[in-house]
Amino acid sequence: FKNIQTTDMYKFFDENGRILTLRTDMTVPIARVCASKFKDSKPPFRYRYTSNVFKVRQKFAGKRSEVTDCGIELIGLDSKSDVQVLCCALEVMKNFKNYTLEIGNVQFFQAACKVVRLSTEEINTLANLIDKKSMVDLKIYLDSLYLSEKIVDFFMHLPFLCGDVNILDEAYAYCFDESLKEVLDSMKECIQSLNELGCLENVTIDLGKVAHLDYYTGIIFEGYVSGVGTSILSGGRYDCLLKKFGRDLPACGFSVKLDPLIDHVDVQLKKKFILYYPESKQIEAMKQANKLRKEGSVILEPSLNETIYVKEVE
């Protein structure tokens, strides 16, 4: 974990002088628990969670240092299962109006860097410039690396390879190695699966999306809702993380940031009902309760009356 950004972590010391940090996300803790507590269990593993996480924020930026995250992790299945996680993410996004799920793949950038044989420092500098879309500085830096015109052209166009799913076809023109085309082939296969499932609405592509955490190894995605100034959902594939805890398993997942949603989205409270019934009509009452649960929560309450009746409560 030596490459993980630590400046956004809250750090303190224990009684033995060891440095401890408050968790900044839940992916690492879940990976550790899966690799250790479930080491004798057979994958795949499917986890869900809700927890508070903590990040040091820039002063006066208007962002909370403590936020509530909830999410899912699918551990033990390879990239062919990405579509399962993406469909879950889209089901979350469908609860809001005017949403967008933006999909990228860090392998597209990583494969290019591997072919060019860039150092870790050079990769990090390039990623930072591409992420910020600092085109002038990016061109100056690429020129300093003395790369071929075709490779420079690839990195200069990378920040702009974004839009609807047709951008994947356009991206082939900038591929200078077969490994880059293989990444695009994999993404097109995933997009085709989403289309067959009827889940392609409001999906966009951003091949210039560069992950900030070093454990992402494949597909990455973020969800946006109109009126919220930040992504409310983010996730991706992290096939190398569990290996650090002694068990080599692929994984993919995402988390949902609840706090910005609470601030910007009206929450529709579900109705509450009490259904009174005589013991002789318990089955009929249960059937009626199942229908009512589509509108809200239902409490079944035995009654001395001979008829079933429903009362809505505040």
Regions found by a protein language model. Name each.
Residues 85, 105-108, 122, 138, ...:
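Internal, well-ordered alpha-helical segments in soluble enzyme and binding-protein domains
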Residues 74, 78, 82, 99-102, ...:
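Cap/lid and interdomain-hinge subdomains that line or gate substrate/regulatory clefts
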Residues 9-13, 20-23, 46-49, 73, ...:
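Short, conserved beta-strand segments within well-ordered enzyme catalytic domains
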Residues 91-95, 109-117:
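Hydrophobic mid-domain F-helix/FG-region of cytochrome P450s
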Residues 66-70, 103-111:
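Short, conserved phosphate-binding/catalytic loop or strand-edge motifs used
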Residues 5-14, 117-140, 147, 225:
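Acidic, His- and aromatic-enriched active-site or binding-groove loops in soluble protein domains
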Residues 1-28, 36, 87, 94:
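TRNA-binding/sensing appendages of the translation machinery
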Residues 25-40, 47-96, 143-314:
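Positively charged, Gly/Ser-enriched RNA/tRNA-binding surfaces
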